[in-house]
């Protein structure tokens, strides 16, 4: 597992996590900026979730505040985790309808991008759609499948997650909109993903699993769902059969240059 400079903050005896004022200011900067950027770009289901969560702007929310809404809508919860967790823990949490949230926030120096998922990425990027039953069901199914999968199978499942939950787009009557949390928590990628620069491809789970990606660049290709309900339908299909077919067919050639050694 990779290492990180970030350390998740621990709760006090009452379960309350104390963040310094500088970190609340980072949250305020991020959420204020991103709420403007996603206007006319985020899908309606995500915007409905944002409204339901009622995220504070002036401070980092406590996890209990998020849990009250998620449990009332879809039965999900968020679970406090360290900055990085192993695949096994990740799948165990999703399989028990718990979404991992690392209780740290990026430094002002990494305001625009960091490789580790921080509390802003997890709560602002992902939690709004966990109020949606279709999205929540797909995420739950994904966790249960990942828990039983082999190491090799998990690599292909990870690509499916990346191309949907993290970096997915969806077709709407108003045009393409964003539902992927990796895009919705990034001002640059929110604008870029809907531009003419990247490729847009109709969603096909087999193709998504065969598509290589890099985590440190703007994505060269985005898969577009016909609607969000497609994720719920996918949860009813034999995803592991698709994994095995993807393993048999192999990966497509990458649409990006190899990462330069540090």
UniProtKB/Swiss-Prot annotation:
Pathway: Amino-acid degradation; L-phenylalanine degradation; acetoacetate and fumarate from L-phenylalanine: step 1/6. SUPFAM superfamilies: Aromatic aminoacid monoxygenases, catalytic and oligomerization domains. InterPro entries: ArAA_hydroxylase, ArAA_hydroxylase_Fe/CU_BS, ArAA_hydroxylase_sf, Aro-AA_hydroxylase_C_sf, Aromatic-AA_hydroxylase_C, Phe-4-hydroxylase_mono. Monomer. It catalyses: (6R)-L-erythro-5,6,7,8-tetrahydrobiopterin + L-phenylalanine + O2 = (4aS,6R)-4a-hydroxy-L-erythro-5,6,7,8-tetrahydrobiopterin + L-tyrosine. It comes from Pseudomonas aeruginosa (strain ATCC 15692 / DSM 22644 / CIP 104116 / JCM 14847 / LMG 12228 / 1C / PRS 101 / PAO1). This is Phenylalanine-4-hydroxylase. Keywords: Iron, Metal-binding, Monooxygenase, Oxidoreductase, Phenylalanine catabolism. Pfam families: Biopterin_H. GO terms for biological process: L-phenylalanine catabolic process. Belongs to the biopterin-dependent aromatic amino acid hydroxylase family. Binds 1 Fe(2+) ion. CDD domains: pro_PheOH (cd03348). Its cofactor is Fe(2+). Its EC number is 1.14.16.1. Fe cation binds at residues 121, 126, 166. One of its GO terms (molecular function) is iron ion binding.
């Amino acid at each position: 597992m990779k290492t990180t400079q970030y350390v998740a903050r621990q709760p006090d005896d009452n379960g309350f996590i104390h963040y310094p004022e500088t970190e609340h200011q980072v949250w305020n900067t991020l959420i204020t900026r991103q709420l403007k950027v996603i206007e006319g770009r985020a899908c309606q289901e995500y915007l409905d979730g944002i409204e339901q969560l009622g995220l504070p702007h002036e401070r980092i929310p406590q996890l209990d505040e998020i849990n009250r809404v998620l449990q009332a809508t879809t039965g999900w919860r968020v679970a406090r985790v360290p900055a990085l967790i192993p695949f096994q823990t990740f799948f165990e949490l999703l399989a028990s309808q718990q979404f991992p949230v690392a209780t740290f926030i990026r430094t002002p120096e990494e305001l625009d991008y960091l490789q580790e998922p921080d509390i802003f990425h997890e709560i602002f990027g992902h939690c709004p759609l966990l109020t949606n039953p279709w999205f929540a069901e797909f995420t739950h199914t994904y966790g249960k499948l990942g828990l039983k999968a082999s190491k090799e199978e998990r690599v292909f499942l990870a690509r499916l997650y990346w191309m949907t939950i993290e970096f997915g787009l969806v077709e709407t009557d108003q045009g393409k909109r964003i539902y992927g949390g990796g895009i919705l928590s990034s001002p640059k990628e929110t604008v870029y993903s809907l531009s003419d620069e990247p490729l847009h491809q109709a969603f096909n789970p087999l193709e998504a699993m065969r598509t290589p990606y890099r985590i440190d660049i703007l994505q060269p290709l985005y898969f577009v769902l016909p609607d969000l309900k497609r994720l719920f339908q996918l949860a009813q299909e034999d995803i592991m059969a698709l994994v095995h077919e993807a393993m048999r067919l192999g990966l497509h050639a990458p649409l990006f240059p190899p990462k330069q050694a540090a």
